[in-house]
Amino acid sequence: MKKIVTVIVLSFLSITLWAQSRNAAYEAYIEEYRYIAIEQQRKHAIPASITLAQALLESGAGKSELATKANNHFGIKCTSDWAGKTYRYSDNRANECFRKYADVADSYEDHSLFLKRKRYESLFALSVKDYKGWARGLRECGYAT
């Protein structure tokens, strides 16, 4: 019985420490990149909260391979019209082509331009303060499918 209780307590502590570590990484990421997201909101009318949320998820708080080696914080893949640098990475398929950026700010700017395509134009009728509407709208428009 003592072993079971010990295992449960240790498991709980491990999960708690992992969650605290993840939260600290998220907070550090937001602190580091919030001004870039705010600038993108000013320039392109995309909520900074949405931009940061997508970057956090896609880049693992800036720790993913794409983020660290290609400055790609949004997992944006190459398209036929992409003339910039590329980075090969196995995501859903082996050796897929992803966009590579000179710096993180370029990744954020390209993400904004990506969302300004026709596919997402309905989102721009929403207020930048309507983050829930933007989140639902991105899903409905097929973002990240």
Where are these regions (language model features)?
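Sec-dependent signal peptide recognition
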Residues: 2-10
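Hydrophobic h-region of N-terminal signal peptides that target proteins for export
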Residues: 10-18
